[in-house]
């Protein structure tokens, strides 16, 4: 279960070098908002098919791609603001809220796909925000660019608990650009935590040769 990895996440060196005294903003964004891929989503994959597809990540061929909403490394939108950011939908609704997390959902054209903004409250004045996509039993999260922001380790642990306990997720995916300088450290750390590399051509991730995807399969007790 994911809880068995939470302490290792908190002790992970990828989250250990958080900046102290960062007063640039009361709100820390743990990931840049990513523009969506092409808008031709065909529908989600069932939990059962997801489990079967992920049984052996290293030996899968191409498959159907529903993933037009899946997170991926940011791109500049022609004619846009050029800062890889997009405004949160004014029609976003609250999906879940407790003393640590506030999760809002943005409407999409595909009723099987949910775009989530997950805000983790660290203090009364500071929070970390993750952008994620929920589809077919899988939660897709982009890791932040650059050094981990202060509080990201606790925020990520709370996010995984939310995926397991509230979403009842079958899989949690992370993605980041292949050209990141800390790519090797990320691969080592998340492999130690139980994440597996998702090979190119996997039917549950977008066709993005510039991005690396890893997956954690949540096992439930009977």
UniProtKB/Swiss-Prot annotation:
Record's protein name: Ornithine decarboxylase antizyme 1
PANTHER family linked to this entry = ORNITHINE DECARBOXYLASE ANTIZYME (PTHR10279), ORNITHINE DECARBOXYLASE ANTIZYME 1 (PTHR10279:SF8)
The job of this chain, per UniProt, is described as: Ornithine decarboxylase (ODC) antizyme protein that negatively regulates ODC activity and intracellular polyamine biosynthesis and uptake in response to increased intracellular polyamine levels. Binds to ODC monomers, inhibiting the assembly of the functional ODC homodimer, and targets the monomers for ubiquitin-independent proteolytic destruction by the 26S proteasome. Triggers ODC degradation by inducing the exposure of a cryptic proteasome-interacting surface of ODC. Stabilizes AZIN2 by interfering with its ubiquitination.
Q: Does the keyword Transport apply?
A: yes
Family of this protein = Belongs to the ODC antizyme family.
Tell me which Gene Ontology terms the entry assigns under biological process. polyamine biosynthetic process; positive regulation of intracellular protein transport; positive regulation of protein catabolic process; viral translational frameshifting
MF terms per GO, please? Answer: ornithine decarboxylase inhibitor activity
Q: Which InterPro entries match?
A: Acyl_CoA_acyltransferase, ODC_AZ, ODC_AZ_sf
The opening ranks of the lineage are: Eukaryota, Metazoa, Chordata, Craniata, Vertebrata
**Protein origin, superkingdom:** Eukaryota
Organism listed in the record: Mesocricetus auratus
* Entry keywords, A to Z: Polyamine biosynthesis, Transport
Cellular component GO terms, alphabetically? Answer: cytoplasm; nucleus
On assembly, the entry states: Interacts with ODC1 and thereby sterically blocks ODC homodimerization. Forms a ternary complex with PSMB4 and OAZ1 before PSMB4 is incorporated into the 20S proteasome. Interacts with AZIN2; this interaction disrupts the interaction between the antizyme and ODC1. Interacts with FAM171A1.
Q: In its keyword annotation, does this UniProt entry include Transport? A: yes
